[in-house]
């Protein structure tokens, strides 16, 4: 048993701190007037829209995007997350999947879902229809009991929902009658919030069945199917989106999916940013800060693994991820020149106190203005201790008009080109380093040059 004096001493320290902060005179209770004026204000919404426009990543496009809606008569917006305001915000944002005592959530009128946005942005005369298509989770009582030991009620937990064929049939009917199908799928807060981990990375509930059915319709009709993935973690997508896995991937199963966008917790105006990108109002420029595996068995699959951690493939599966760190497409094409280091010392070698200045020419070879995120990676070619093959050191966002070229420059301190020794010290080892510049972390997307450190 604790002595009561110990509790008194602890309480005394807390009260003394509150006194020093002036909380007894001014408890600083929430200012409702300020809350109403600031939270979800026009400036907040403008900033959220700007950030989301730049963060949504276009991962696949067979040429169907941007979609020209001027001649479209009907667009089908499908999926359990197409009109889900809470999933756009994420966990602990106005509400939570972890407790049942939160308020009613973020005011709905402040949130623009994907369905809302298409209704607002399509031309007059184009009808937007919605079908849910699938459920993700069913909420059931916690098997641990209705209450926590302290008497607080336990929230219900989410379990994977069963496939609902009637919902899929409704979505198929809408898809057949539409010029464009936008399917919004992913995770809900019960699966990604605090204290929540799933035993699989696959889409749960009836989502895979829905995507397969929509993909079949798209192949039969030739109408574009755009999949929007809302998730805050990498997910394993079905064959209808990324093809059939194997040592050699069979892409034929994914021919029905025209395009794929990833939107991680896009926020209040997320639906507007997504619709703008699909309709070509906004140029996609987001790049992946994570890597998407093809199968959970590939993990770990992040780009900067220690050399020798994996072979080049499994016996039954490629080691290449579905989508790699740094990947993301736009609506134009770019051509990279060869990287050049322009400040090599007369000795031919840099010292640890030097900075490497590198330049590369980037050209917009397409017909639209576009944004490219030029990425610079460093690799220490021979190391005394096992270390990663390459690491991102810098990146630049470059906007170019059609036919325009620009020299993109990077200044990388040699002191940043470190490895970690067995004593956990970061050190720069003398020797040859490679500078890799390009579109993503994939080797085939990078241009290479080398420099020496003495």
Predicted regions and their residues:
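Secreted, periplasmic, or luminal enzymes acting at the cell surface/secretory milieu
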Residues: 1-115, 119-159, 230-371, 377-379, ...
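Glycine/threonine-rich flexible loop motifs
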Residues: 86-89, 185-205
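Structural alpha-helical scaffold elements that stabilize or flank donor/cofactor-binding regions
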Residues: 171-174, 253
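An anion/phosphate-binding loop that grips the pyrophosphate of nucleotide cofactors and donors
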Residues: 178
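Short, hydrophobic/aromatic beta-strand segments
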Residues: 369-376, 388, 420-422
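Intrinsically disordered, low-complexity Pro/Gly/Ser/Thr-rich segments with frequent PxxP/GP/PP motifs
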Residues: 384-420
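Short glycine/proline/serine/threonine-rich loop/turn segments at secondary-structure transition edges
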Residues: 416-432
């Amino acid at each position: 048993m604790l002595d009561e004096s110990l509790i008194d001493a602890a309480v005394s320290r807390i009260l003394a701190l509150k006194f020093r902060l002036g909380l007894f005179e001014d408890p600083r209770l929430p200012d409702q007037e300020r809350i109403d004026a600031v939270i979800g204000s026009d400036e907040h919404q403008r900033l959220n829209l700007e950030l989301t426009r730049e963060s949504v990543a276009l991962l696949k496009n067979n040429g169907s995007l941007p979609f020209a809606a001027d001649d479209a008569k009907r667009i089908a917006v499908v999926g359990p997350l197409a009109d889900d305001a809470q999933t756009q915000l994420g966990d602990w944002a106005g509400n939570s999947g972890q407790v049942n005592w939160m308020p009613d959530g973020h005011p709905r009128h402040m949130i623009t879902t994907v369905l809302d946005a298409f209704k607002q942005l399509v031309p007059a005369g184009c009808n937007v229809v919605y079908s849910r298509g699938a459920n993700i989770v069913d909420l059931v009582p916690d098997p641990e009991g209705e209450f926590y030991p302290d008497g607080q009620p336990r929230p219900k937990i989410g379990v994977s929902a069963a496939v609902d064929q009637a919902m899929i049939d409704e979505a198929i009917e809408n898809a057949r009658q539409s010029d464009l199908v936008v399917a919004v799928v992913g995770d809900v807060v019960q699966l990604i919030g605090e204290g929540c981990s799933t035993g699989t990375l696959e889409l749960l509930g009836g989502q895979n069945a829905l995507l397969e059915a929509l993909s079949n319709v798209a192949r039969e009709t030739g109408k574009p199917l755009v999949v929007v993935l809302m998730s805050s973690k990498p997910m394993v997508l079905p064959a209808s989106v990324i093809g059939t896995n194997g040592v050699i991937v069979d892409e034929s199963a994914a021919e029905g999916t025209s395009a794929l966008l990833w939107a991680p917790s896009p926020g209040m105006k997320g639906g507007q940013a997504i619709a703008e990108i699909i309709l070509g109002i906004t140029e996609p420029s987001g790049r992946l800060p994570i890597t998407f595996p093809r199968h959970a068995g590939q993990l770990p699959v992040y780009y900067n693994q220690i050399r020798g951690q994996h072979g080049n493939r499994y016996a039954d599966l490629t080691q290449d991820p579905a989508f790699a760190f740094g990947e993301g497409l736009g609506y134009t094409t770019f051509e990279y020149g060869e990287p050049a280091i322009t400040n090599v010392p007369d000795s031919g070698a840099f010292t640890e106190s030097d900075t490497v200045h590198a330049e590369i020419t980037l050209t917009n070879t397409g017909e639209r203005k576009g944004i490219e995120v030029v990425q610079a990676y460093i690799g220490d070619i021979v190391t005394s201790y096992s270390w990663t093959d390459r690491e991102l050191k810098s990146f630049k966002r470059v906007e170019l008009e059609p036919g325009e070229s620009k020299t993109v420059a990077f200044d990388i301190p040699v002191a940043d080109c470190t490895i970690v020794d067995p004593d956990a010290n970061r050190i720069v080892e003398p020797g040859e380093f490679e500078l890799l510049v390009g579109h993503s972390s994939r080797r085939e997307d990078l241009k290479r040059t080398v420099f020496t450190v003495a």
